[in-house]
Curated annotation (Swiss-Prot):
Record has DNA-binding as a keyword: no
Subunit structure: Homodimer.
Cofactor(s) listed in the protein's UniProt record: pyridoxal 5'-phosphate
InterPro entries noted in UniProt: Aminotransferase_I/II_large (IPR004839), DapL/ALD1 (IPR019942), PyrdxlP-dep_Trfase (IPR015424), PyrdxlP-dep_Trfase_major (IPR015421), PyrdxlP-dep_Trfase_small (IPR015422)
GO biological process: lysine biosynthetic process via diaminopimelate
Organism: Geobacter sp. (strain M21)
Coiled-coil regions listed: none
Pathway: Amino-acid biosynthesis; L-lysine biosynthesis via DAP pathway; LL-2,6-diaminopimelate from (S)-tetrahydrodipicolinate (aminotransferase route): step 1/1
Keywords assigned: Aminotransferase, Pyridoxal phosphate, Transferase
NCBIfam families xref list: DAPAT_plant
Protein name as annotated: LL-diaminopimelate aminotransferase
Annotated residues for binding of substrate: 15, 42, 109, 132, 187, 292, 388
Gene Ontology molecular function: L,L-diaminopimelate aminotransferase activity; pyridoxal phosphate binding
Membrane spanning residue stretches: none
């Protein structure tokens, strides 16, 4: 009989969202008349913009004609999209990238997982706590860790607590690590990193021959001009960092699927024989073997984001969500809650009222307010006592949810 990958049996974090779903279903069955508002999951609610949709339709029409039909595309992505990203997204930041350093994909979640294919299993990995579960779970799946302890920490991973005391920004590990996951603007805490803070991590990585895996999925939500959108705005980062970006929240592509990875040509690792080798070449080899490229209509739609009208429409949706974030942040703060995030980031990270665990507060919001959020403890032990709310909801629902919470907390 074929053997399974036993590493999957070590996973604990998969419990979070199924448990949320179970509790919500049980509540709905017992309270069929209740209107439940979901501010937990990070899915968008605004439709694709007219310019993006027009490009999508035109690309589909291309597939209907023998003269314009497109079959297999380049695994690295079409030049029309790569060129647009390099010129319209990175150059305005002062970042010069070669087109050969960019790889179009079907989403950054997959990329954050698949990038592990080009790293040796005996690398020491550091992740934040609380953290986007994909970083943790994919390292467990491939066999880099032992079992989780009673707190939920896996043996073999280095956890960097991100707490109220350190401004939700991780301190450098005491031990040497080879790979470091950083996510800014952060999911789930909504924290952002200054250029000086990122420079500290770049300097650390260069001094320790480490590689930073930088998740910039929410960079489009930054409004403060002093906050960097890319780690490559820091000198030296091309020698120590891989960057991930996504169209999911930026352009409403959660159901369309498109992302990108930047792997600089000067980024190198070491072979088992101690020789230097290009990570760019390894990732290209990986992609050409395991990936056939994002679809032509999707890439045409993504390229439309970078047209003048396309970006104007996209920015309007981003502004819509950030207004939601302001409403949530200010509304909950006025109710006496301690609130973080929601500025330069679409997530609000709040402290639960005294005496309530993350799951206690989840149950209170569900049962008393009919509002669903995400318990902070589901993102890691350091998330206990916190709660995440998303700004990606419909405006009317967001306003109503905040009013319900405010009214309940004043009782």
């Amino acid at each position: 009989m074929a053997k399974i990958n036993d590493n999957y049996l070590k996973l604990k974090a998969g419990y979070l969202f199924p448990e949320i779903g179970r509790r919500v279903r049980a509540f709905a069955a017992a309270n069929p008349e209740a209107k439940v508002i979901r501010l937990g999951i990070g899915d968008v609610t605004q439709p694709l913009t007219p310019t993006i949709l027009k490009a999508f339709h035109e690309a589909v029409d291309d597939l209907a004609s023998e003269n314009s039909f497109m079959g297999y595309g380049p695994e690295q992505g079409y030049d029309f999209l790569i060129d647009a990203i390099v010129e319209k997204s990175y150059k305005p930041l002062g970042v010069d990238l070669k087109t050969t350093e960019m790889f179009i994909s079907d989403g950054s979640k997959c990329d954050c997982a698949n990038i592990l294919d080009i790293f040796a299993l005996d690398n020491t990995v550091a992740i934040g706590d609380p953290v986007y579960p994909v970083y943790n779970d994919t390292n467990v799946m491939i066999g880099r860790t032992g079992d989780a302890d009673d707190k939920g920490y896996y043996k073999g991973l280095v956890y960097m607590p991100c707490t109220e005391e350190n401004g939700f920004f991780p301190a450098y590990p005491k031990e040497k690590v080879d790979m470091i996951y950083l996510c800014f603007p952060n999911n789930p805490t909504g924290a952002v990193a200054t250029k000086e803070q990122l420079k500290g991590w770049v300097d650390y990585a260069l001094a320790n021959d480490s590689i930073i895996l930088f998740d910039a999925a929410y960079e489009a939500f930054i409004t403060d001009p002093s906050i960097p959108h890319s780690i490559y705005q820091v000198e030296g980062a091309k020698k120590c960092a891989i960057e991930f970006r996504s169209f999911s929240k930026t352009a409403g592509f959660t159901g369309v699927r498109c992302g990108l990875v930047v792997v600089p040509e000067e980024l190198e690792g070491t072979t088992s024989n101690g020789e230097k080798y290009s990570f760019n070449k390894l990732w290209l080899r990986r992609q050409t073997t395991k990936f056939n490229g994002a679809s032509y209509p999707v890439q045409k739609a993504a390229a439309a984001v970078y047209t003048e009208q396309g970006w104007k429409e996209t920015q309007a949706n981003i502004d819509y969500y950030m207004e939601n974030a302001r409403i949530i942040r200010e509304g909950l703060a006025s109710a006496g809650l301690t609130v973080y995030g929601g500025v330069n980031a679409p997530y609000i990270w709040l402290k639960t009222p005294a005496g309530l665990t993350s799951w206690d507060f989840f149950d209170k919001l569900l049962n008393d307010c009919h509002v669903v959020g995400t318990p902070g403890s589901g993102f890691g032990p350091s998330g206990e006592g916190y709660f995440r709310l998303s700004a990606f909801g419909n405006r009317d629902n967001v306003v109503e949810a905040v009013e319900r919470i405010k009214k309940n907390l004043k009782k």
